């Protein structure tokens, strides 16, 4: 794989399928059945054991780091229960490994039938010491790589003690067996990875086995399987509790409904009176609301009528005042006209009297004065009538 491809894979693992903003780049979703659920949980045996002596090859399902990143983001908001599928996958794989281990043990047991139980126990002791030394040496290498020199020195002291115990156990085992059978009985099966181990292998070889990728890969798979079992058991327990809680709630509701129906059937009068009281209270509340609405409407109507009557009275008063003013103006004009007319007539009469002093003229003047006085009275009567009409 080139450096560019490695960088692209790292970006997919960190940011998911839509790292470039293109959502159509990846048509398959992580929830698809074609996607390996063990790969999404980072525990697929095809990935863990790749490059070892038990390499399983390429997985039949889809493996994509971007899909794993999408699943990690989505699993924070929703539980997809992919742990169950991964647990089934790992269980089948570990069961196959345990089956191979049992077969290898049976093959070794067929060649070791003549060995007594005491000799077998001594051989078991030698093998246990070999495993202990190998694990301690692998730990020493790990501590040295981390730079923890003091801890690695302490572990090396334990390794030396285990080596001394191993030499003693080998001496006891060698003395308890004949020389011919001692050379034949030198193999043992590893309980973790089902690989063959020699009873007389040196420490370096044992350390390489226990610190190797195959053995550590099987340890990782077995630990992941135990973790998945625990997680699945917790989730199933939680789901069972929720289901039981919902069932109890349904049963409680059903009991409550049954109790209510029984109480209604036992006391129909009480239920009727209850219904009657409810209906009555509802009707009373409706009546109160209706009254309040009608009162508010009446208040609004009164207010409007008062305002309209006030406006009408004001307009009527204004019209009355205006009519009075107009009538007064008219009367003033008429009185001034009559005054001028009387003065004019008086001046004319004086002139005529001075000119005509005959009795005939006097009679005519008297008739004329009587006629003009009658006309003045009629005009006064008309002005008074017009004044009254204006006031009305």
UniProtKB/Swiss-Prot annotation:
GO terms for molecular function: enzyme binding; mRNA binding. It is found in: Nucleus speckle; Nucleus, Nucleoplasm. Residues 235-392 are annotated as: Disordered. One of its GO terms (cellular component) is nuclear speck. The modification Phosphoserine is found at residue 18. The modification 5-hydroxylysine is found at residues 266, 269. Its main location: nucleus. GO terms for biological process: mRNA splice site recognition. All isoforms are expressed in brain, kidney, heart, thymus, stomach, skeletal muscle, testis and spinal cord. Residues 102-177 form a coiled coil. It holds the Pfam family LUC7. Residues 258-321 have a biased composition (Basic residues). The keyword Iron does not apply. Keywords: Coiled coil, Hydroxylation, Nucleus, Phosphoprotein. May bind to RNA via its Arg/Ser-rich domain. Interacts with SCNM1. This is Putative RNA-binding protein Luc7-like 2. The lineage of its organism: Eukaryota, Metazoa, Chordata, Craniata, Vertebrata.
